[in-house]
Amino acid sequence: MDEIRHSPEHFLKEIEKEKQNLNRGHLKIFFGYAAGVGKTYAMLKAAHSVKRHGIDVVAGYIEPHARLQTSALVNGLECLPNLVSEYNGITLSEFNLDAALARHPQLILVDELAHTNAPVCRHTKRYQDIEELLNAGIDVYTTVNVQHIESLNDTVASITGIMVHERIPDSVFDNASQVELVDIEPQE
């Protein structure tokens, strides 16, 4: 049996990779089967819970909701200003990645993981913004629905008849530190 012998450089690279992983933030995804099941609500409730335990929590971007209970949960959280821009005569409000990196909280809330950013943003997709936050050592809570996962998109579309264009690579979901399923009881 041949023994594989690694060079000292190989081991140094492995040690450096481990150091980077130790400094990387953790991703928690609030995962649902459809819009309106309460993902943002659950994320905000969890944020208030960890804040009570002394964690520095900031709302980076929360999708505006017509649900009063969800909107009320933003109260008591520091909210970063959105990045506002004009595009084709429309005013767009986006997650402000630079403000988040400058503030550098322990935990940031960023709704809608699969969102496609406006052209003024550094990254095309919100999951890329979140990746940058994680690499900066910031923990992230976010939300996503099953149909936005690349490998499940076609299957969900064949059942629902609805094709979504905003998707995340499976690797983003697979690399999450924690996934919390959020669902509601079917109506009788």
Range-by-range predicted roles:
Residues 63-68, 114-115, 140, 146-151, ...:
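Conserved nucleotide-binding/hydrolysis micro-motifs of P-loop NTPases
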Residues 112-127, 151-154:
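Conserved ATPase-coupling elements of RecA-like P-loop NTPase cores
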Residues 37-44, 48-57, 120-121, 140, ...:
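An amphipathic, basic-hydrophobic helix/alpha-beta surface used to engage anionic
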Residues 9-23:
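Pre-Walker A adenine-sensing motif
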Residues 147-188:
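Conserved phosphate-handling catalytic cores of large alpha/beta enzymes
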Residues 108-110, 139-146, 175, 182:
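Structural recognition of the conserved hydrophobic beta-strand(s) that form the central parallel beta-sheet
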Residues 24-102:
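Conserved P-loop
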Residues 56, 104-107, 133-142:
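Loop/turn-to-beta-strand initiation segments
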